[in-house]
Amino acid sequence: LWVLPVDEQLRPAGPAELLIGRGEDPRALVLGDRLLVFYCVIDRDEADAVAGSTMMLAEFALADGRPTLLQAFGLPKNPLQLAAAGDRGAVWEKNWVPFEISPTQVGLIYSHDPWHVIALDCDPARDARRFVGHFPGPSLSWRHGHIRGGTPPLPYGDDQLITFFHASAVVGSRKVYAVGACCFDRAAPYTPRAITREPLLLAPYNSGAHRFGWPFAGSVVFPLGAQH
């Protein structure tokens, strides 16, 4: 995972630097004077076969805008002890979406359908990180696919947060991805309140990715982030 300085128009403004040597699907959150990066790593068994994925948290100190690694560790799999369903089994964890609850606590959208938010204690005065709350709510089902992940939420009005998610549905011979948005209460229990009925973005069916040697025959679009 790399970091790249950008200007006000989000254009590259300097060289890229390696931040984390192994990982994918990062979501970053500034919490006080720290940068928290939630990401996943692919697990492999003794035969080097894919055996799921693990969510990771890397904490960085921010000094003069430059991150210095403090610690990085794996987060528990299936923290809510949910029954395995689809790719949300006990061995697969990814796409947790972080947002600030307080200077020492982070909320994590664990899933949209069913809706689950987990509170994580990130007090810098304590070395250990632990889950300190669980807030289920009404499921957000979407006819354009099963919702996964999303951008770290931003304020929407006085009392809500908004996040832009991605979803996928099988169309013909491939998965087609779409982007939507949902709003939920800023305060506990973080109840979801609204969702876009139609996609804000829809990936083209013929993406042309095969031209670049990418074997995945999917039509993919992901929201990377949102600027307030």
Map each language-model feature to its residues.
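Short basic/hydrophobic patches in alpha-helices and adjacent helix-turn junctions
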Residues: C183-R186, L224-H228
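Beta-rich carbohydrate-recognition and catalytic domains
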Residues: L1-G21, V30-G145, P155-F216
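Beta-propeller and closely related beta-sheet repeat lectin domains
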Residues: R22-R27, K94-V97, G149-P152, F222-A226
